[in-house]
Amino acid sequence: MYRKLAVISAFLAAARAQQVCTQQAETHPPLTWQKCTASGCTPQQGSVVLDANWRWTHDTKSTTNCYDGNTWSSTLCPDDATCAKNCCLDGANYSGTYGVTTSGDALTLQFVTASNVGSRLYLMANDSTYQEFTLSGNEFSFDVDVSQLPCGLNGALYFVSMDADGGQSKYPGNAAGAKYGTGYCDSQCPRDLKFINGQANVEGWEPSSNNANTGVGGHGSCCSEMDIWEANSISEALTPHPCETVGQTMCSGDSCGGTYSNDRYGGTCDPDGCDWNPYRLGNTSFYGPGSSFALDTTKKLTVVTQFATDGSISRYYVQNGVKFQQPNAQVGSYSGNTINTDYCAAEQTAFGGTSFTDKGGLAQINKAFQGGMVLVMSLWDDYAVNMLWLDSTYPTNATASTPGAKRGSCSTSSGVPAQVEAQSPNSKVIYSNIRFGPIGSTGGNTGSNPPGTSTTRAPPSSTGSSPTATQTHYGQCGGTGWTGPTRCASGYTCQVLNPFYSQCL
């Protein structure tokens, strides 16, 4: 993205690269979150910062753009080093240009604001440092409203192992640092970043053929990634992505792997990860818009994710005061509702693809959980595959019987960015009520441990039941390997959703 401003004045830092200018003052929107212990939660006064890739990048001595549309200035940016010396990042008009607003503990991201599309923000500990979270042995909870996110959009909340200062101390060329949203990395080793490691990414830059604002450069930025929440109103996924090197590293060309390279699996990170999407696992009535779903995405919900010290990952939800466990899944020899080594192996066997252990699996991503990770909150559309991997049938040539291909109910013709941007510009996501602490401390949206009196509507992990036992509404009542109740409570019937899962509806 770029902006044109009339005033001509700039803060010059000629001795360093990836500089800072002040045509627009940089004021981080405040955002309150809570740190929890067994005795309760304490408010923390944080803020959010916009990623550097969205910012106006211009000549340090004028308002001439260094990056315009999806191309670099050949005069200011003949190579990576010269470009970084000549160009600066400017402050952001968060609400007016990017559609980013905060109120108390809530962050709202608008999809389209004037010419801007989407956004990516980080939670700050102070004005120049990202807030870091050690996930191992802890849980992370937040409220989310995805009611305004149709097919093709992704309101993503996740953690990455990027440097807390945005790489400012590690790379002398980076004068902007975390204050201006630098240092991003993830498991796709993105090559669309304008600056990496304090230098520009202009060498080898190829403007996108289908996106007027982006391109692919000669370098990428890799690090471990934990996708807590990738979702719209139709589908949601929880996915760990390990990298051979936990922290941020720069890669070159197609050896980066990931979305931006011809060799997707040629890098040091796992671009696919080990995902848990209830719809993909056969539970097509757990999550979606309307009262026919266990979790109704027309309403706000609370998402609680727990990280055991062995690297396994558990999840439950709270909506309208009712607790919903992650639904059980039967995948090959695996039966349960936790991402662990057995599940990841069974998923790969059942659905195909590369082995989750190729880049170290849960043992490797657990190293990231044991260190500091930065919280990312974003909203985006997908110019690569139209978000079909999240909410539709993918690959699109798969048949109805292809294991793991059906990920959501969206049409395979949906999600085309040009159409989504034109038809749903007012889409938005709201993240709020962020809480973090030891397992059992965040209490969902109640401020206490999950209430024992709440109804758990997802399948229980029962090992048996008496012949007279009945299952509640939305509970599992049959399927391959199921040994729990097969009778439903009065008013409901046991309906077969697939060979592995029947549900009381």
From Swiss-Prot:
Disulfide bond listed as a keyword: yes
Alphabetic keyword roster: Carbohydrate metabolism, Cellulose degradation, Disulfide bond, Glycoprotein, Glycosidase, Hydrolase, Polysaccharide degradation, Pyrrolidone carboxylic acid, Secreted, Signal
Annotated glycan sites: N93, N126, N283, N397
Post-translational modifications: O-glycosylated. O-glycosylation of the cellulase linker provides protection from proteolysis. Linker glycans also contribute to binding affinity of cellobiohydrolases to cellulose.
Temperature dependence comment: Optimum temperature is 50 degrees Celsius.
Region annotation (Linker) ranges: 450-468
Keyword Signal listed: yes
Protein name: Exoglucanase 1
Gene name as annotated: cbh1
